[in-house]
Regions:
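Nucleotide-activated donor-binding/catalytic signature segment of Leloir-type glycosyltransferases, i.e.
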Residues: 54-58, 199-218, 227
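Short hydrophobic beta-strand element within catalytic cores of glycosyltransferases
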Residues: 254-259
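A charged, aromatic-enriched C-terminal amphipathic alpha-helix characteristic of glycosyltransferases
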Residues: 281, 288-320
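N-terminal strand-loop element at the rim of the active site
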Residues: 7-13, 20-67, 195-198
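Acidic donor-binding loop of glycosyltransferase active sites
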Residues: 75-77, 223-240, 253
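Short alpha-helical segment that forms part of, or immediately flanks, the ligand-binding pocket
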Residues: 222, 245-250, 264-265
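Conserved donor-binding/catalytic core segment of Leloir-type glycosyltransferases
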Residues: 4-6, 141-144, 152-168, 190
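Donor nucleotide-sugar binding/catalytic pocket of nucleotide-sugar-dependent glycosyltransferases
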Residues: 105, 112-143
Length: 320
């Protein structure tokens, strides 16, 4: 069976990583063939991400929606899979079965199968009537970290975050990080793929606030996670699933997250393992009094979101 996987852009972001993993394990676990299709001129295309896909899959790009069905026919695809916001946008096929995977709070059923990316989103939008296929959480394993490379002491407490460049967006969290960094030199904040919100100078070097570029290197990402003692989440929108949250969670890192976000799939999955804050006072107390507890089980994702369990669900919802 051939599945044509559509993503608007091939990027550093979570949906592209999700598509990569679905396509990879569609081949390795379900023994199907995976082909990739994306928008040629999308401004969010990321060169290293495109190259990563090309190393594993046949990759097609298009400029106009009417090219999709030609690519479906040319590749002899049996299923057209599209991950998208959830709106009717013309991204579907008339030439084969179409599976729509909705990542946001929309309910505009189209295609042959319309499913959400989390149980929380299905409940939120359809009281659980619509099916859901979650993302899988799979990262490369290494025992190495980046502390020596980044000049971070072994005994320092490190709060980390990776994700979309503009989605670390709670102003009071940014303000608090700057304030704490001035007083607590034993606390470090390390961000990967996140726009800097700190003005550094010779007078205010903020050596304990570090911004790293985004990376497609899975081992480097694993080293980054190992560098951190906890994940600091500060996204107003929240998460309809939360891949980065899951990657830290399976590495047994506590997740510190805002309780009042609009989308709460990550909070739903974390349950009592979530470390919640509602305001600056809460977060200041959490950070200032944080103690590393490696004996506690912080992992809320490994059991439900392994590649095998997710692909079994993918097959039952989208393929069968």
């Amino acid at each position: 069976m051939k599945i044509l996987f559509h993503e608007n852009q091939l990027s550093y972001r979570g949906t592209s990583n999700a598509v990569y993993n679905y396509a990879l394990f569609n081949q390795e676990y379900l023994n199907n063939e995976s082909i990739i299709i994306h928008q040629k001129n999308n401004k969010n295309n990321f060169g290293p991400a495109i190259e990563k896909f090309k190393k594993k899959f046949e990759v097609h790009s298009y400029s106009n929606l009417n090219e999709i069905d030609k690519i479906v026919s040319d590749t002899k695809s049996d299923l057209f899979y599209a991950i998208k916001a959830g709106k009717i946008d013309g991204v579907e096929s008339k030439n084969c079965k179409t599976a729509i995977h909705s990542v946001f709070k929309y309910y505009e059923p189209h295609g042959d199968v319309y499913a959400y990316v989390s149980e929380w989103l299905s409940k939120e939008m359809t009281n659980g009537v619509a099916p859901f296929v979650p993302h899988m959480i799979a990262i490369e394993k290494t025992d190495l970290d980046l502390r020596a490379e980044l000049n971070i002491p072994k005994d320092a407490i490190v709060f980390g975050r990776h994700g979309g460049d503009t989605t670390f967006d709670l102003p009071f969290v940014k303000k608090l990080i700057i304030e704490i960094s001035k007083k607590r030199k034993d606390i470090y904040f390390v961000f990967m793929g996140t726009n800097s919100f700190v003005f550094k100078s010779i007078f205010t070097p903020y050596k304990n606030i570090i911004f790293l570029p985004k990376s497609q290197d899975e081992i480097y990402k694993s080293k980054f996670i190992n560098t951190c003692d906890a994940y600091l989440h500060a996204r107003q929108q929240g998460e309809s699933f939360g891949i980065a949250v899951g990657e830290f969670s399976i590495a047994n890192k506590p997740i510190i997250t805002w309780a009042n976000s609009e989308e709460k799939s990550h909070i739903d999955i974390l349950g009592d393992k979530a470390v919640l804050y509602t305001n600056e006072i809460d977060l200041n107390d959490i950070i200032q009094n944080f103690k590393v507890d490696k004996d506690k089980n912080w992992d809320a994702y490994s059991n439900e979101f392994s590649s095998e369990r997710v692909m079994d669900k993918f097959k039952s919802v989208f393929i069968d």
